[in-house]
């Protein structure tokens, strides 16, 4: 359509020139040829075989984010034939050639920044012009870095095992929105930092479950897409978690009465022994308070007799008859006596001569 229109304009101009020429002029044909060769109105306009159009990559249709120091290398393909003219602008102004370089090819244009800085952020526009036609594409570039630290942090209150903190936002957010704050604690003894809250969006918080008897310091980092701030302010005061004074009131209770009159749980057993061989008699008694143990032979007290040795320990009573003779045979009695009563057990001992 564009080619046909251009040819029609050229034919019409040529007819107008021929009609205006005088046939009687001696130099008519020569002058006409000169006019045809030299008149600007007779020059044919270049034909547009392909309209200009920019094929913007999908990734660049939203804000293109890079970190400070990274390389920006954008290739933007376009169409247009013959080769169109390409013009780049940054925020409506020409590019700074000391920082940004552009390479234009037959079918694409490359925008290159070796080390991006925050000042390189903004709106970049590519304009492709061909004849009276043009196509434009806009690319938003955002160069970001780590945020600065919060300006201050203050320990507001300490109660029980809890501490209240407040801080102010950082002055520099790194050229992008903050994702939140990271709160950490460290006890005075170990000095190790542990994270309490991550990506916390408020500028005040309550730290709970602190250990009684410890003293804690706190610090806060700011965070954005690049990560945590390089430094963090630390509370000037320590949070001392005091042990609450507890008053114990003893409950009254009835003391159990364990008093008991003597009672033999294991009686004496009758035995037969041989003359000259030591013999022992055993029995068990239970009583509270501790009873007095008395040994009798044929109802005669044996206390103080060196031939016999009486022992009593943990309720076990024993009587040793040293080298018995036939005279030592008889009825032996063990008697237990305390304030609540008394009890006794008997056994018969026979002493035989050896065969």
Swiss-Prot record:
Subcellular location: Cytoplasm, Myofibril, Sarcomere
Polar residues compositional bias, start-end: 1-15, 29-43
Residues covered by region (Disordered): 1-43
Keyword flag Phosphoprotein: yes
Residues found modified as Phosphoserine: 39
Sites bearing Omega-N-methylarginine, chain numbering: 322
GO annotation (BP), single: in utero embryonic development
Ig-like C2-type domain residues: 46-140, 262-346
Keyword tags: Cytoplasm, Disulfide bond, Immunoglobulin domain, Methylation, Phosphoprotein, Repeat
GO cellular component, one term: myofilament
Domain Fibronectin type-III: 149-244
Cysteine pairings via disulfide bonds: 283-334
Chief location: cytoplasm
Domain of life according to the entry: Eukaryota
Entry keyword annotation includes Oxidoreductase: no
Function: Myosin-binding protein which plays a role in cardiac function. Seems to regulate conduction in the atria and ventricular conduction systems.
Homology family: Belongs to the immunoglobulin superfamily. MyBP family.
Protein name as it appears in the record: Myosin-binding protein H-like
Naturally occurring in which organism (per UniProt): Rattus norvegicus
